[in-house]
Amino acid sequence: MQNNSFLARLVRGNLVLQILAGILLGAAMATFSPEYAQKVGLIGNLFVGALKAVAPVLVFILVASSIANQKKNQHTYMRPIVVLYLFGTFSAALTAVILSFLFPTTLVLATGAEGATPPQGIAEVLNTLLFKLVDNPVSALMNANYIGILAWGVGLGLALHHSSSTTKAVFEDLSHGISQIVRFIIRLAPFGIFGLVASTFATTGFDALAGYAQLLAVLLGAMAFIALVVNPMIVYYKIRRNPFPLVLQCLRESGVTAFFTRSSAANIPVNMALCEKLKLDEDTYSVSIPLGATINMAGAAITITVLTLAAVHTMGIEVDLMTALLLSVVAAVSACGASGVAGGSLLLIPLACGLFGISNDIAMQVVAVGFIIGVIQDSAETALNSSTDVLFTAAVCQAEHEKRA
């Protein structure tokens, strides 16, 4: 009976407070028992693995089900959401350029990224994304290719739109069943994050980051400015009321989990659950959230821009205003393709460095610096990217709902 009441309290408890407790316990274990802390990292890896496993199936079934069951004259709000995604990513790149000029950073270049192969140009990044669109559906599900999964989900949904009500009901029941599995996995977040924090702190520590304090300050400062100043301004423009309750809820309930899982794909189920909690339009968020995990990359745009300009300052290259603006555009477009590159935003740095004639050898040393600070940079980048997916979806859904009310 006591066990049942403990489990009931666990299920009914405040998830954010439970996650906070997991963070504190993980940090304490890493401090006092690093050896044991590395072992409990298994719990964290299992949690991330479970989220990554369920996410592709969730997206495919949810998209197919919502489109197949869509009523006539029912509106989805994808166009304004995509516009916000692209505008937000460009704003992030521009903010990073301004901060990099205000606080120029030079790097002690590192080695250690020799095994990585960056794309040869922006055409290659866009080409990769285009071919992901026509991937085999089984391959797309196995490799968590969300562009391909979305394409097949939308295609199947449209094909089943005129099918019998029984077929549609099967897909709807499947989507509810998978959503239940997702809710169960999300309730395990405190344990997963406890394991992730404990193993990360025990393995990495923060001594390695001390030498890159200014670079991290510029990176994190730009991300914080986007999260707490630019995004609220964009949301206010859409909903015309105080944006901070929504902004802070998205950061708290999506950003915190994304920070520790360091995976936009793993955070898709968390974002879907938050959209459901906010009572947003399911036909819209079932498409906009996985699409956002692929193209809404404000954090990646900041990483590419800041590290590229740090390389520029290190090499003593003069940069004029037009080149800086061009870098913002290249960083924003490259960031939208970051999901199509193994290694993500860091391996798009050589592409941006090419604008300034920086050799590939130097650019790959900058990438190596990115790997050193990755424990913080990648976490903060994912938190910003993923929480913004929900934020912009919620802002558009709420604004459109009030317009039609």
Curated annotation (Swiss-Prot):
Protein's gene: sstT
A GO term, aspect molecular function: neutral L-amino acid:sodium symporter activity
The keyword Cell membrane is assigned to this record: yes
Catalytic activity: L-serine(in) + Na(+)(in) = L-serine(out) + Na(+)(out); L-threonine(in) + Na(+)(in) = L-threonine(out) + Na(+)(out)
Record keyword Transmembrane helix present: yes
Name by which UniProt lists this protein: Serine/threonine transporter SstT
Main location: membrane
Biological processes, Gene Ontology terms: serine transport; threonine transport
Any single Gene Ontology cellular-component annotation: plasma membrane
Family indicated by similarity: Belongs to the dicarboxylate/amino acid:cation symporter (DAACS) (TC 2.A.23) family.
Matches recorded under Pfam families: SDF (PF00375)
UniProt-annotated location(s): Cell inner membrane
Lineage: Bacteria, Pseudomonadati, Pseudomonadota, Gammaproteobacteria, Vibrionales
Annotated membrane topology: Multi-pass membrane protein
Alphabetical UniProt keywords: Amino-acid transport, Cell inner membrane, Cell membrane, Membrane, Symport, Transmembrane, Transmembrane helix, Transport
Organism (species): Vibrio cholerae serotype O1 (strain ATCC 39315 / El Tor Inaba N16961)
Transmembrane spans: 13-33, 43-63, 81-101, 140-160, 191-211, 215-235, 297-317, 338-358, 362-382
